[in-house]
Amino acid sequence: MTHEKPLDVAWSTAWIRGAAAAVAEHRDELTALDAAIGDGDHGTNLDRGMHAAVAKLDSQLDSRQGAGGVFDLPAGVLKATATTLLATVGGAAGPLLGTAFLRASRIGDLPVLSSQDVAMLLNEAAAGVQVRGRAEIGDKTMLDA
């Protein structure tokens, strides 16, 4: 199957926007699930962080006005998302998700990603969560989800 759209900055930004929309849509459900086993703030924290990430991307993309730089690369979008999540999402989720996006941003200076590149960045993200959380498959963590 071929992609109709390139896996570039526009794609990576749309991916973050889609994730933010999904989190917003399921915020209350995520919070209720967390309340059953924790402090009940996961949905709220994650929603706040994802909205902040989208706002950061919007401000950076608007201000660059075609000037080039890291926001011409999917890795720049992923790194900006990582740093925003690290700064805005509390609890264990902030460091775990921030690390996931930071590791994914190691994809490098590729303006357009292949499907193999996307698979690699997702594997890097999972590896980051595993290392940061000291988790193994089967430990009933987000790696198992």
Language model regions located:
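N-terminal loops that bind phosphate or other acidic moieties
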Residues: 1-145
